[in-house]
Structure formats: C-alpha cells, structure tokens
Amino acid sequence: MAHEVHRIKPKLGRTQIFWVFLAFRVLNAVLTRTFFQADEFWQALEPAHWKAFKYGELTWEWKFGVRSYLFPMIFELTYRLVSLSSILLHYALLLLSTIGSDLLILLLPKYELSWQVAEDLKRLPFDVTRSFEYYGVIYAPKIVMAVLASIGEYYIVRFVQKLYLLTLDKRNEKEEEERRSGLSEITKFALLLSLTNFFNCFFITRTFINSFEMILTSIALYYWDWTGGQMIKESSFTKSLIFAFLACLQRPSSGLIWVIPSISLILNLVGKKQYHLLFITFSKVLRSFFLVFTANAIIDMYFYEKVTFPFFRFLKFNFTTPLSKFYGVAPWHFHFFQSLPIVLGASIPAFAFGLFFPLSKRSFPKKYLNPFFQVKLTILLNLLVYSTLPHKEFRFIFPLQPLFILISSFGLLRLDRDYWKRLSGLKSLLWLVPFVSVFIALLLDTFHESGSIEVMKFLHEEPEIDSLGFIMPCHSTPGQSYLHRSDIQDLWSITCNPPLHLLGDPEAYSKLETYMDESDHLYDDISAFIYKNFPPPFRKDLRSPGKTYSHEWPTYLVVFEHMENAFLKDFLKDSSYIEYNRFFNSLAHWDSRRSGDIIIYYKLPFDYSDIPAADI
C-alpha cells in the first residue's frame, strides 16, 4: 500500500508545488502590515524579542507559565541571527569606511569637503547597521513564517493526493484509470483552494500559534496511517505521532483532531486480532510522546529557567476554571455560523457538497475505515466540542484547515466532473471568486488597522523618547517587536490582566462577573480614571501633596481617535500637549474604543509649572 501511494505522480511536481506556495506566501507576508489580534505579537514575537535582546515586556501568560516556548523560540533564533548578521555587517562596513576615510584624507587633505565626507563615512556603519537590524527584526520573522506556512500548505496538498490514491476503486480498472488521471486535477484544486483561501491569505503568515498548530497538524495528517494499520511499522507513522504530539503540547485542544482516527485504527487492529501491531502502535505512541515531551520540557525550562509544564497549566486555566470567560463569551453556534464561513471562504459550496455526498466509490469492510468518514466525523466532533467552550474565536478552528481543504478539493472534483460540464459559461465566472477572495484579504492585510503597526515604526525612528504611554485598550499595538528601543526610560500602557487570584476560589464564577481590569475601569468612566491615576497635566504644583499616581504624563502619548473625541481633546487643550502625528487605522471597527485614527500627542518642553502661579 505504501508503494501504491507513491507510484502515480501528478503533472505538477512536488518541488514545483512547494516553490509556488513559497513565492506566494513570501509576498503575502511582506505585504501584510496590519493588526489583527494581540496574540500575533504578544504570544510569539514579544517573548522571543525579550529573550533575544534582553528587554521588552511579557504578558501574564508568560509570567504564569501557560504557554509553551517552542513556537516563540523559532523567532528568538531568527532575532539572534539578525543580531549576529548586523554585528558582522557593522565590522565589515567599519573596516571599509575606515579605509575609505583614511584614503580620502591622505589623497585630498586640503579640502574641507574631504574631511566632511570622511566623517560621514565613519558614521555610515552605525546608521546602516541600525537600520539593517531594525528591518531584520520586522521582516525576518515574516519570511520565516512564510516558509513555515509553505511547508504546511505543501503537506496539505500531499495529504489530499495521498487520500485520493488510497481511496481508488481497485475493482474497476476502467474507473481506476479515470480516477488516476484525475490526480493532477485534484492537486490543482487543492493548490488553488489553499493559495486563494481568504483566511489563509489573511492569517497564515501571521505569527499566531494557531498557524503553527495547523502546520504541524498538516504534516502529521499526511504521515498518518490511513490504511487501518498496514503502515504502522513504517517510519512515516512515527513522524505523524511526533508532529501530532508537538501540536498537542503547543495547544492541548489539538488532541481532538486525533480522537476519531486513533479510535478507528485501534478498532480495526482489535477487530482483526492483530495484537502485535497494536503493541507496536502503543509502543510508538509512548516513545514518541516521551521524546516530544522531553524536548518540549527542555525548551520550556530554557525560557522559564525552571521546570515548568505549560500543558497542564493551560488545561487548568481554560478547562477547570471559569477564567477563560474573562476574554469574552460567544453563543454556542458561533463556530458553525461565523468561524466556519470565515475560515472556508469561497470554498463553502465545494465543502458543503463534499460534506454531504460520498467522495469515494471504493467500498470499505467497515465504515469507520473510510478516511473520508473519519475526516467528516473529526470535523463535526471538533466543532461540537469547541462550541461548548465559552470563549470562541475564528482562529481556534484554523488547525482544521487541512481537513476543510481535503473535503473541499474532493467536493470540487466531483462538481467539476458531474455538473460543471453543463455550465461551461458559469464555470469561467466562478474562477473569478478565488481571486476576489485574495483581493479582499490583501486589502485587510495592507489597509484595515494599519495604524497600529505604522505608529510603532514611526516611534522607532524618533530621535529621543524619554517617556511613552498608551491610553487605549490593552495590547492594541505590538510592543518591542516593532518599537525595538531599549532607551525609553518610562514606557507604559493600560493593562488587562485576568483575575488570577481567583484560581482555586470556589466563588470564582460569581466574583468574575464583577471583576474589572484597568482597561475596564478606564472606559467605564474616562474622566474619573484620568483624575484618579494621572496628575494634573498643567502644573506640577497642583498635585495633591503626598499622593502617588499610577501613571505620569509622558512626552509621547498615543491614543485612538475615540479617546480623543470622548475626553482628551478638551482635557489637554490648555496643556503643553500638541497633536504630533496621526495615522489612519480603520474606517470602522467592531470595538468602538479602537475606532478612527491613531494619534500621537507630544508634550512640549515648555511647562506651565515654570511660571509662578501669581503670574498666570
């Protein structure tokens, strides 16, 4: 059976498939310059930056130890490579500039211009390497993520090809030849559906753990034994277990994907009384788990500097306490009627057809041995279980994307063969749909919420910043992964830490309802929050004697337009603050607090406290 899978090859070779994905995703990643959700930065790039450059800020998840460091470590290594490259570049340029400036002075010592150029040459290595390091910090993780995404999508196509060949009807030679000739066609459909999927174009190259989980799952699904036990002795099955366990240790919920395939495999081995294969299976499972768990534990110990098992803390926080509700509660049908359409995109019709109609005419001795039955049941199980959890987001079901593309590809193949020949005119129009999806995704990648990124790039370029503050919902911008400055003495933002003190509290459910974080207090009553937590912005001698404040007014103050209109514009109009710059962020936003532009206020060096009160 293993040889059967590799005997027939499509017209588009494996190397070509990978390079198509890589070229497209690198472009996709480089063009992406917008903000989607905080986890893209604060759960991947920020801890990596903190570890690589020794400065930055960690969110509560990293302080509490609920995150595994494997994924961020990829970017730490990336940052370290960027840093090393910038150091080597600096010394190379320093050598060249020193030689160049000395030669210039030696040859043309009488000209003042020669001395000026020589001074500029000496400064050049510092300016170039500073820019090189910053752009490396910004773009190197994008390239790395594009490579990882390409690997994941490549294995999605391989997974589709594998199941296509495994589900051929061997009893009908004529049909078998017809279906074998369709391998190139199914490859083309899988390639197209993955490349032009709206959510893939918008999400897959962003540094979310869900993207990494999907990539690991794609590899594991391809190497999985879909024959019911005939390939258990192969090294490919071991690879599947390793990548599956890696995904599970990053996010334990990934284990749901493997419930149905595992049960089907065990049932078949038990039914056939192949106990020796069952023993080999469990042996491989234990060895693979031990290997992955040990490696992952070492990586986590490297980051936390003590023995830490984020896997168990993640389960405790999300499944044994109500604290996950702190980040929002969605209705039970959210994943069925919102997440699924968003992740599927334009492939909804093909997916629906593939889901409700048989995709293989091959008969299986047991229904549960049919790979398509396992895949469909896996999708249903995951959606049902995720629907029982209070906190829901689109990206939580993204690891199911390989299964979605599998069903959609086979659905599209059958639609193409059985129906579209009668609708040749409509078929040409339908080819426009995927490209419209890409266009919309690119608009969101380059336009909507671009201010959250651009403001950090701008602040990086400012010559001197003594203090910088963000009065906006927590984590509305990246941190040091885009700011990349260690010289700011006072850097703060509004926080939104969950009530970790309620862990283990029997009254956590009721207390959670009344808990308010700093962001909640701010927007509950903006004026009261400002007067309580900030000193008067006009005169230092107006401060209440002996009173300490949570925040001081910074030299640079960053706010959303909503905050400006609601309070700060009038409040600061007689202060030394001026509007310094403004960045477009969104035309509309689901969160009204983040609506409009992002504005930078700058506090002029002139201070009213320099003038005696009697003279005002």
UniProtKB/Swiss-Prot annotation:
The answer to keyword Transferase applying to this record is yes
Which keywords accompany this UniProt record?
Answer: Endoplasmic reticulum, Glycosyltransferase, GPI-anchor biosynthesis, Membrane, Transferase, Transmembrane, Transmembrane helix
Top-level EC class as recorded in UniProt: transferase
User: What is the first-listed, main subcellular location in coarse terms?
Assistant: endoplasmic reticulum
Give the CC-aspect GO terms.
endoplasmic reticulum; endoplasmic reticulum membrane
User: Which is an annotated GO molecular function term of this record?
Assistant: alpha-1,2-mannosyltransferase activity
Q: Where are the transmembrane segments?
A: 17-37, 87-107, 137-157, 189-209, 241-261, 279-299, 339-359, 393-413, 424-444
Q: According to the UniProt entry, what is the EC number of this protein?
A: 2.4.1.-
Pfam families associated with the record: Glyco_transf_22
Q: In which pathway does it act?
A: Glycolipid biosynthesis; glycosylphosphatidylinositol-anchor biosynthesis
Lumenal topological domain = 38-86, 158-188, 262-278, 360-392, 445-616
Provide the membrane-side ranges marked Cytoplasmic in the record: 1-16, 108-136, 210-240, 300-338, 414-423
Summarizing the function annotation, the protein's role is: Mannosyltransferase involved in glycosylphosphatidylinositol-anchor biosynthesis. Transfers the third mannose to Man2-GlcN-acyl-PI during GPI precursor assembly.
Q: Which family does it belong to?
A: Belongs to the glycosyltransferase 22 family. PIGB subfamily.
What is the name of the protein in this document? GPI mannosyltransferase 3
Q: Which organism is it from?
A: Saccharomyces cerevisiae (strain ATCC 204508 / S288c) (Baker's yeast)
